[in-house]
Amino acid sequence: MNYKTQREAARKGIETPEMKKAAEKEGVELKYLQEGLAAGKIALPANRNHLSLQAAAIGAGLKTKINVNLGISRDCSNMEEEMRKVEKALEMQADAIMDLSCHGKTQEFRKALLAISPAMIGTVPVYDAMGFLEKELSEITVAEFLQVVETHARDGVDFMTIHAGIRRTTLERLRKTPRLTSIVSRGGALLCTWMERNKAENPFYQYFDEVLDICREYDVTLSLGDACRPGSINDASDACQLEELITLGDLTLRAWEKDVQVIIEGPGHMPLNEIEANVLLQKKLCHSAPFYVLGPLVSDIAPGYDHITSAIGGAIAAAAGADFLCYVTPAEHLRLPSLEDMAEGIIAARIAAHAADIAKGLPGASEWDWQMSKARAELDWESMFKLAIDPEKARRYRAESSPELEDSCTMCGQSCALRNMKNL
């Protein structure tokens, strides 16, 4: 094999099995996908050690993808429960799963996940560092941070969040212009603490070339983390966030020089009216690299309903050009999500992604909606259930009611507009 990464293969005009599979899934020409990979506008996360992977691509002109977060923690360390979530996420057509495990047998869980998942798998190595190394944060050396990155890569992880964009200069800016909610990124806060305690630069920024060498060796896509993402709408689009974004743009070019694929992570909490501008800024400053957003959550008042605030922002962001949505569940800001929380979050994210694909004018995006509308016009309930994004819920709601007329529902009964027009 005379290439190390999908990007290198694309630049050399080599058609890889992963490219062919991804192009077939998307219904696009292989050449289009290949050119997008070579230009950095598309990423195809595919670690050569992830043997169960069914490759999928993220980026310009492709369907908006969704990611599901899960993993074990100190308070919730039940691996069996998290594996049930994995199975449910795959059943519900998640495109990617991020293992955010930060305590316990993290490598055991990660390997089990990689063994069964056809979806791409992402991790955040800095989360795992203290548990894996069994050391206090400030005592971890640069070499040990890199060791954890390489362990994740060797295990088969397809993409990794690396918070390389937050620097000591960013901390100085944060002191000069304080935020309402400071740093809310877990990885960002860990690195801020490490930098302050050791009076040193962010190790992932200072030793970025070493990170790139690891990513290149295993073809791990670099998901450049937004340590300065706003944790409240009050802090959105501030200097701290934008300073980091400029740094991420510079790091993107350095990664591409080594043929390492890149995704850029984005906000966060953000008012509706700022979302489109932020997407345009990211595409401009980060050279059209795929954009991966957490939400954005368009309001801060809805604990228990943040899958809704997130879906609103995600639909707007993706319609404006974001490529990858991280789901948010009703449990956001409250607890580790349950299986039921996860399912609600997935449906909300999938609706947002699909709505955005229609707005983007992707070929075939509205065909699903046409089929559903046709079934409704014909009062074809069975087809409606099969076409629903959540068939189980649609069937349950219908079964819980007893309409007077079998082909109507309990909302309108004999006054059903479609039924009456059909019978004219």
Curated annotation (Swiss-Prot):
Gene3D superfamilies attached to this UniProt entry: 6.10.250.620, Radical SAM ThiC family, central domain
GO biological process terms, semicolon-separated: thiamine biosynthetic process; thiamine diphosphate biosynthetic process
EC number, UniProt record: 4.1.99.17
Positions that bind substrate: 69, 98, 127, 163, 185-187, 226-229, 265, 292
Protein name: Phosphomethylpyrimidine synthase
Catalysis: reaction(s): 5-amino-1-(5-phospho-beta-D-ribosyl)imidazole + S-adenosyl-L-methionine = 4-amino-2-methyl-5-(phosphooxymethyl)pyrimidine + CO + 5'-deoxyadenosine + formate + L-methionine + 3 H(+)
Family: Belongs to the ThiC family.
Function: Catalyzes the synthesis of the hydroxymethylpyrimidine phosphate (HMP-P) moiety of thiamine from aminoimidazole ribotide (AIR) in a radical S-adenosyl-L-methionine (SAM)-dependent reaction.
Keyword Zinc among record annotations: yes
Cofactor: [4Fe-4S] cluster
Catalytic EC class: lyase
Cofactor info, note text: Binds 1 [4Fe-4S] cluster per subunit. The cluster is coordinated with 3 cysteines and an exchangeable S-adenosyl-L-methionine.
